[in-house]
């Protein structure tokens, strides 16, 4: 157990730059390029495997990815507010995720509507499903 953890910033440290892509290129990216950039940026650990909720191993390819665009926890923020404000960024994210698996499920609240993403990877099928009800209706495990 830590009593404290101190992280010192190196004043001579260099910025890290990542490759960038326009919206039309995202769905055509190679899954290994996506994985490499997610890992280098530290975002790989945001993914969770089921049933044990661990970060996936590098190189692992899921049968499907579930994007939970709802939260039914009491007093939870409605993610649709942010998604609607940044719809292009949300769709770009779905296009990138589509390169990682053959199926992507976007799960949203029954009262919300999401326009379908314009372009996904050629090998991917993206499905939209709506859910209603109180908690735990918004949990990924419930959607699976």
What are these regions (language model features)?
Residues 2-144:
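Buried, small/hydrophobic-residue-enriched core segments of structured protein domains
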């Amino acid at each position: 157990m830590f009593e404290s953890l101190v992280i010192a910033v190196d004043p001579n440290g260099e910025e890290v730059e990542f490759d960038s892509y326009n919206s039309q290129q995202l769905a055509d990216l190679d899954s290994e390029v996506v994985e490499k950039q997610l890992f280098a940026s530290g975002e790989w650990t945001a993914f969770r495997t089921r049933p044990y909720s661990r970060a996936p191993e590098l190189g692992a390819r899921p049968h499907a990815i579930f994007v939970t665009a709802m939260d039914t926890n009491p007093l939870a923020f409605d993610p649709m507010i942010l998604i609607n404000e940044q719809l292009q960024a949300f769709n770009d994210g779905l296009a990138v995720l589509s390169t990682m698996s053959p199926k992507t499920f976007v799960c949203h609240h029954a009262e919300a509507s999401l326009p379908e993403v314009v372009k996904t990877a050629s090998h991917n099928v993206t499905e939209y499903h709506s859910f209603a009800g109180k908690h735990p209706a918004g949990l990924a495990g419930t959607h699976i």
